[in-house]
A protein has these predicted regions:
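Bacterial N-terminal signal peptides that target proteins for export
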Residues: 1-7
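C-terminal segment of classical bacterial N-terminal signal peptides
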Residues: 12-20
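Repetitive, compositionally biased segments used for assembly/scaffolding
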Residues: 20-158
Length: 158
């Protein structure tokens, strides 16, 4: 009984003491902007309107049309078609998946249909429904509304 209690306390306390052991993170020079996900129940999902990263009023949310990452005029915004420094998308397995940008001209943009990260035929594109990164059934895809490990968004700190 005593050993079960110790295991229970350790299972609860370890994630609190060492959250980085269980969470994916950005580089040392990047700012974490949440998880690019269709899952509205993940606390750090961009689809969670009540969370910090999906809230249209949060300053660092890509959903805030007046914020740095959601404004149609900011160079670091996901919705600026002429943006030059949109957030990076990093998959749970560490694969770089391009930039979450509305620019159809940026070679790293997921909106460039001829680019490596925007093509619906590329294996590293979130727009390819047959790849592990774009499938609506993959646990690491942003397009799966039940995904548990969707990719993270990282902004470049300057």
């Amino acid at each position: 009984m005593k050993s079960k209690l110790i295991l229970l306390v350790a299972a609860i306390a370890l994630p609190i003491q060492c959250p980085s052991a269980f969470a994916q993170s950005c580089d040392d020079d990047g700012e974490y902007l949440g998880r690019l996900s269709a899952n509205p129940f993940l606390t750090d999902s961009t689809a969670n309107k009540f969370g910090s990263f999906g809230n249209p009023y949060a300053s660092d949310s890509i959903e805030n049309p007046y914020g740095q990452y959601g404004s149609p005029y900011s160079a670091t915004s996901v919705s600026n078609p002429y943006g030059t420094d949109a957030p990076k998308i990093i998959a749970a397995d560490g694969q770089y998946l391009g930039r979450l940008s509305a620019s159809p001209y940026d070679p790293d943009s997921v909106s460039n249909p001829y680019g490596r990260y925007g093509s619906p035929y590329s294996p590293t594109s979130i727009n390819n429904p047959y790849s592990q990164y774009g499938s609506p059934y993959s646990p690491i895809s942003p397009n799966n509304p039940y995904a548990t490990k969707p990719p993270i968004l990282c902004a470049d700190d300057e």
